Amino acid sequence: ELSMWLPEQLGSSVNHQGDQPKEQDVVLYGFGRIGRLLARILLERSSSPLGSGLNLRAVVVRKNGDKDLVKRASLLERDSVHGPFKGVIEVDEENSTIIANGVPVRFIYSSDPTTVDYTEYGIKDALLVDNTGRWRDVPGLEQHLNCPGISRVLLTAPGKGDMKNIVFGVNDNVITDEDKIVSAASCTTNAITPALKVLDDAYGVERGHVETVHAFTNDQNLIDNFHKGDRRGRSAVLNMVITETGAAKAVSKALPQLEGKLTGNAIRVPTPDVSMAILNVKLTKPAGSAEELNELFRRESIDGELRRQVGYSDSPEAVSTDFVGSRTAGVVDSLATVVTDDSAIVYVWYDNEFGYSCQVIRVLERMGGYDVPSYPAK
């Protein structure tokens, strides 16, 4: 029985010699919270025996003083939330290079994306990940494509206009070779869309409301000060802050059948990482019971097509910090599930930094034509 079951689960990988992954240059434009986590993941994979096919070649930032490179290396090496970098980091200031686990990463200083010629650094046909959030439309992001050495751009924020917003596992199949600029949507959209797809596929979603209890971000103030956004000027570490979120409406860019069916709000809370989305939905077909609904999510997390996006927790002791470093887009907390007639309330934990970064990497791999094998095979 085992001899029959294993080939079925491993799919085409059985007896397949495999080709070396295509080498794909990657450039990070920006080096904030998401940029550094993307760098960590890419460097972690580069130093593994299997490699990844994605080579982090350069990071573009604005220079902040003489010790800029040393400080950025320190931020990559030490993280108050995600812990120390797994490996060795060296700094070559003379060549503006950080060497991580033997992998050299060139730091290019520029405040204008149109002024960089990446081919001068031996970079060609690169995928550029813009994680600054400064430009979110095609005209703004096209500036990168005008630079020699850049072939495609991935935005780590919700894209505006007709730009494709990709939630890996849900609609990454719509990416084509002709797409020069795509968006990886937001952390919250990535967390809730897979769970909503599971619900919609099984029961149908007529309407719903999404409430996100979100960790504070760099966009908020440490102490009370001016902020152009309502309420966000108040101290992030002392207050719960009601604010807006476009995540619920953005779901329809990945699941068009849910357009106009979802509303959403957000509450920023005094925690540095890991957030929770509460999905309150009316179903077309009643779920029957919380146990039935939980079993649906449990099975999906084990061998469903969305198993890399949907996690499952049944621990009565789980709290937010337990999900720091979670590689899934979201984790359903089964003990909080509520089902009443045709209504369901589902609680989804998500690491809004690392979990989202893993989703971004998956989109990057798809754009580069490289998909990491996962098992069971689907």
Give the residues covered by each predicted segment.
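Short glycine-rich or small-residue beta-strand-to-loop segments that form or flank ligand, phosphate
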Residues: 23-30, 181-183, 277-284, 344-350
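NAD(P)-dependent Rossmann-like dehydrogenase/reductase catalytic/cofactor-binding core
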Residues: 1, 324-378
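A generic structural signal for alpha-helix starts
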Residues: 190, 285-288, 355
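N-terminal Rossmann-like NAD(P) cofactor-binding subdomain of oxidoreductases
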Residues: 1-222, 227-230, 338, 360-363, ...
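Short, well-ordered loop/turn and helix-capping segments at boundaries between secondary-structure elements
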Residues: 44, 201, 253, 257, ...
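Short phosphate-engaging motifs
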Residues: 136, 162, 247, 289, ...
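C-terminal substrate-binding/catalytic lobe of Rossmann-fold NAD(P)-dependent oxidoreductases
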Residues: 49-117, 207, 212-344
